[in-house]
Amino acid sequence: MNFTDSHCHLDFDAFSNERPQLISQCASANIHQIIIPATHPANWQTVLNLASKENYHGCNLFACLGIHPWFLEGLTIAHLDDLARAVEQSTGPSIENKSKKIIAIGEAGIDGGIAKQQDNLNQQIMFFNYQLALAKQYQLPVIVHHRQSHHYIIPLLKKAKLTAGGVIHAFSGSYQQAKEYIDLGFKLGVGGTITYPRAKKTINTISRLP
C-alpha cells in the first residue's frame, strides 16, 4: 500500500541538511507522494523548486502556494497580489513540466490563538478570504490551518462555495464541526494529536466518522 503525506513543510531550513535522507526514508515507508504547503512569500520559490524534481529520492513532491496566518506581520495587500500572480504563473496551460504546477492553495486559515487584537483578526480574515477566492477562481483545493477558529472558518467556507474542497490540517474539534467540513467537501487531516490520551474529543470524533 502506498501513502501520501498531505502536509509536510519539507522546505523549512531545519530540513536543509537532511532533506534527501528524510525523503528516502519516506519512500522506504511506502510514502511516495508528499504535499508541501507554502507559508510565506519568502518560501514560495523553494516549494516550487522542490516540486519540480520528478521522483526525487523515490517520492513525488507537490507544491501549494499560500500565506499562513502565523506569518502575516509586515504583509500587505500587495503580497496578496503577488500570490495571485504566482498562482497564475504556476497553473497556466503554458507550463510544460506539469510537476511545476501547484495542486492547492495554502497553507491558509485563521488562528484564534494569536488573534489577540481585532486588527490582527481582521487581517487574518482578509488574507483567508482572498486565498479562498483564488482557490475558487482556479478550482483548486485549500489547505486550511485552524486553531480556536472553527466558528470563523466554517461560515467563511460556506460563503465561498468552493468547488474543489481541500484538507483541514491537523483537525481537532467536535463531531458536528467535522461533519460540517465533510459536507463542504473537505477531508480531515489527522495529526499526532490523535495518539494523545488527553485528546478525548478528537479521538471520539474521528472514531464516529465514516
Regions found by a protein language model. Name each.
Residues 1-210:
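Mid-domain alpha/beta scaffold segments of enzyme catalytic cores
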